[in-house]
Amino acid sequence: MEFISFVYTLIAFSSLLYFYLIWSESAKPKTTTHKAPPEASGAWPVIGHLRIMSGHPSAGIPHVNLGMLADKHGPIFSIRLGVHRVVVVSSPEVIKELFTTNDVAVSSRPSVKAGKHLAYDNAMLGFASYGAYWRQLRKIVSLELLSNRRLELQSHVSMSETGQFVKELYKLWEKKKSDGSGTEVGEGVVVDMKRWLGELNMNVVMRMVAGKRFGSGDNAEETKRCRRVMGDFFYLAGFFVPADALPYLGWLDLGGHEKRMKKAAKELDEVVGEWLAEHREREFSGEGKAQDFMDVMISVVKGADLQCEFDVDTIIKATCGTLIAGGTDTTAVVFVWALSLLLNHSHVLKKAQQELDKHVGKDRRVKESDLNNLIYLQAIVKETLRLYPPGPLAGTRRFTEDCVVGGYYIPKDTWLIVNLWKLQRDPRVWSDPLEFRPERFLAGDKTFDVKGQDFELIPFGAGRRICPGLSFGLQMLHLVLASLLQAFDMSTVSDEAVDMSESAGLTNMKATPLDVVVTPRLPPRLYNEIVEIY
């Protein structure tokens, strides 16, 4: 038995060495007048820099690791992830060149196992490579699902869910006050804000996409199942499996990650498939007209020529899955960071509440029409997005042709990583870049926007692949933050600062819980006037 294991090990090592030598020869740059970007030090044989991108606790956070390499090698350098050459950039000048002059050439995605197993073989918009299918699907999503008109039609969803969120927090405070269990924190009650904000955001997105709302009532089991399935998807979608770096080892499924991806994909397909069946049955019976995004997709995709091998149901399920994944996790991440920053900077929190008291008052709830007047609150959101972009490494791209970027030659099929986390902390652009100071967007930096035109600040990306849900995300961030700050005074449980440890993954979620002491600051009638949702 030991001899057989030795033979397998010898074969595997020999295969690795053979393919590595072949790749090393093929990876040599073509003869050109431009030199290649400097390669970061610390590469291991065969696997290259894979360890610093693994997300393993002992290896550090990938975007932080790449930021330190940028300090050493400059704003454009290369790393090796197994057989793949990867260019990492973090300067606004280079990024502008990429997303203007070379935008088409960097609008495709590399082929990874997550796209194959979790994203319906890359049918999801976020995983699909640039081409006719992606362009048509992007058009449908932008014009039919996430247009300003469609968001206006769905605005009641975010308002009602935010109101329900505020009311449920108030009811929790009332309960704790009546049974005396909240006395250890004075007049307030301790709330796990990561969980509460995550559930709020999920309910908003679920109602808009599939007409579903999850709570603790009759559909508690479905709620639990959906949360688990979505949690598995978020975790695994950002996982870089060994076979992505070393394709010839794919048959080994090292670590069993592909098996987990297939299981998660099957469960996700079952959940979204059940919703689709319900919608089709409603359409067939003639009950009502299109209301949520899935209804719209059923109607629109029928007559669309998407020039792809996917069937209609797969496209609908993949697109709705994209909207749920993109809409729930990323926005919740920013909520948590914003609240954490405010708790660590109480003077900023008080200033935001003073702005709300001035423009809205305490005799009514804040409305969407008030948001344009809340300039300081908008600056808080911008500053949060600057320091903690929800996707710190954006989405990995692939060069589809040879390019010259920043004076360096980049061959076709090179991968591209844009380190937004490092870009938005550039001391050449931002004074005191590590400080949380919303006032910067009311003074010298007030012209900076987050909509992809100012390449110093692109938390939602830029170019053709900019996040299509940008407007919805900003709308939700402003509304929820305004509602929460107007309705409650907030503080930490102890005198200690909030732990700001980051985590590795597709999104940059705060690594530790966020326990917050909330105390109502409005008249009781304003909480009780909120209509229950059933």
Swiss-Prot record:
> Would you say which domain of life the source belongs to?
Eukaryota
Q: How does it sit in the membrane?
A: Single-pass membrane protein
Name of the protein in question: Flavonoid-6-hydroxylase
Cite the InterPro entries for this sequence: Cyt_P450, Cyt_P450_CS, Cyt_P450_E_grp-I, Cyt_P450_sf, Plant_Cytochrome_P450_Monoox
The organism's lineage is: Eukaryota, Viridiplantae, Streptophyta, Embryophyta, Tracheophyta
Pathway assigned in UniProt: Flavonoid metabolism
Organism of this sequence? Ocimum basilicum (Sweet basil)
Cofactor dependence is on: heme
GO MF term set: heme binding; iron ion binding; monooxygenase activity; oxidoreductase activity, acting on paired donors, with incorporation or reduction of molecular oxygen
Task: Answer whether the UniProt record assigns the keyword Heme to this protein.
Answer: yes
Similarity annotation: Belongs to the cytochrome P450 family.
SUPFAM superfamilies xref list: Cytochrome P450 (SSF48264)
GO cellular component annotations of the record: membrane
